[in-house]
């Protein structure tokens, strides 16, 4: 279930970022920061 939740959240975030028309590099950097923060909260 955790993976399903992560997948849904990631897809939702990607859709939101598309609204801001960010470049691929900016999107990747944003997602990387988000994942690192999420992993820190999980630990």
UniProtKB/Swiss-Prot annotation:
Residues given in the record as Ca(2+) 1 binding sites: 7, 9, 11-12, 14, 16
For this UniProt record, the keywords arranged alphabetically read as follows: Calcium, Cytoplasm, Metal-binding, Repeat, Secreted
One annotated GO molecular function is: metal ion binding
In what tissue types does this protein appear?
Detected in muscle and cutaneous mucus. In the skin, detected in cells in the basal region of the glandular epithelium of the dermal mucus glands (at protein level).
Q: Which family does it belong to?
A: Belongs to the parvalbumin family.
Entry keyword Calcium: yes
Q: What does this protein do?
A: In muscle, parvalbumin is thought to be involved in relaxation after contraction. It binds two calcium ions.
Q: Which species does this protein come from?
A: Rana temporaria (European common frog)
- Which residue intervals define the domain EF-hand in the entry? 1-20, 22-43
UniProt main location, coarse:
cytoplasm
Q: Where in the cell is the protein located?
A: Cytoplasm; Secreted
Name the chain's protein.
Parvalbumin beta
Q: Which residues bind Ca(2+) 2?
A: 37
Which Gene Ontology CC terms are recorded?
A: cytoplasm; extracellular region
